Structure formats: structure tokens, C-alpha cells
């Protein structure tokens, strides 16, 4: 046992068992703090790990600094696999640099960025590649002016488009109102020309287009005039038949009397 070493401690179980009326109770103890020596060892380990992380980060930065982004105009025959084989890079790197999700997104761009190694053969031998700062001036000028115009007055353009849409809607409403007025005027002219036909069309169809006074007259005819006419007709008919019968009886009586007188005068 060396000087400065902590004295050995007896073994202590992590659980104390106590008896109770219901059964046994298990008491768990909290873990005691480790001695200062362990904390010093951890500090030494941390101090040893720090320079390693710095070295790895510096290496990563050096690796990133070795790459250079160059641009190339896109043609219809290009694709990501062809560009990756031609310039010795990965398809995933080209997608990551240009923010491409699919291969078809490449054809929406005029030029594509290709990651190549700095001071390599491709940067010196191939003339198609150029840095993003070396774009032609005639392409940069209109793009800058367009961006300035778009970013300068976006709201004004939206307002003008909105006002144009409102004007178009107003013109459509005016045309629709004119058409409706023409239809109403034509229908009014037709109603004036046809007279009673237009009035008949205004009925709902359940009363056959008959007015209330027409219905009253029809009821008077059916309920009063026709029964009176019926009674008068049959009474006159009965009186005529009785008169004819009386005349026939009188004629027959007179004929019988005349025959009797004639028979009495004869020898």
C-alpha cells in the first residue's frame, strides 16, 4: 500500500433488505461520487482528445479548400453521369453543388457548376470550364438589371395585375347586364305583340288561365240559368202535349156525333 492511496473499503451491496409486516422492503442506495483521481484522469483524456479533433477539422478544411467550382454551359446531350465521368467527380457532388434533386432538374439551368481539384489538369487543359466570376459581361448585365427591376418593384407589378383583373371583371359584368337588358326588352315586345297570350302565360296553369269573374259567370250559368231553362222547357213541353190530346179528343167526339146524326136522318 503506497502513501497517498485511499484505504480499502469494505464491500457494500447496492440494496439493503428490511423486513416489514407486508413483506420485504428493498432500499437502493445512490452511487457515491468517484474519487478525485478519476476526475483527473478524465481531464487528461479530454486534453489528449482535443488536438485530435483539431487535426481532423483542419484536414477537412484542407480537403474542402482543395476543391474548386467551375461552370460549364449545358447542352442537350449532357447528363450527370457523362459530366461526372468527363471531369472525374461524383454525381452526388454535382447535385449537392447545384441543388439538384433529380437529373431532369439540370435541364432547367443554362450552366452547371462542377467541383474539380484545384491546380489539376482539368482546370488548366479544358477551356470549357470557367469560374463563376468570369461570366460574360453581356449575360451578367441583363441578369443584374432584371434582378434589380424584380426586387425593386414587385408589389407595383402585383397591383397592376390585380387592377387589370378587376377591369376585366367589370367589363364582363357590363356585357352580361347588356345581354340581360336585351333579353328583357325582347320579352316585353313579345308580350305587347301577343296580348292575351302573354296574359295566359302569366297564369300558373292550375286554373287554365281563367280569371275570377269568368269563374263566377260560369257558376251562375251552371247553377241558375241552366236549371231554369230545363224547368221551363219541360213545362212547355208537357202543356203542349196536353193541348194536343184535348184537340184530338174534341175532334173524335165531334166526328162521332156527326156520324150519329147522319145515321138518324137516314131512312
UniProtKB/Swiss-Prot annotation:
Cytoplasmic-side segments: 233-267
Transmembrane segments: 212-232
Bilayer topology term: Single-pass membrane protein
Glycosylated residues in this chain: 79
CDD domains, per database record: LysM
Keywords annotated in UniProt: Glycoprotein, Membrane, Transmembrane, Transmembrane helix
Bias (Basic and acidic residues): 49-64
Residues of the LysM domain: 70-114
GO CC terms of this entry: membrane
Extent of Acidic residues compositional bias: 35-45
UniProt biased composition (Polar residues): 142-152
Chief place of localization: membrane
PROSITE patterns given in the database record: LYSM
Subcellular location: Membrane
InterPro entries xrefs: LYSM1-4, LysM_dom, LysM_dom_sf
Extracellular topological domain residue ranges: 1-211
Location of region: Disordered: 30-64, 130-152
UniProt protein name: LysM and putative peptidoglycan-binding domain-containing protein 4
Organism ancestry: Eukaryota, Metazoa, Chordata, Craniata, Vertebrata
Gene: lysmd4
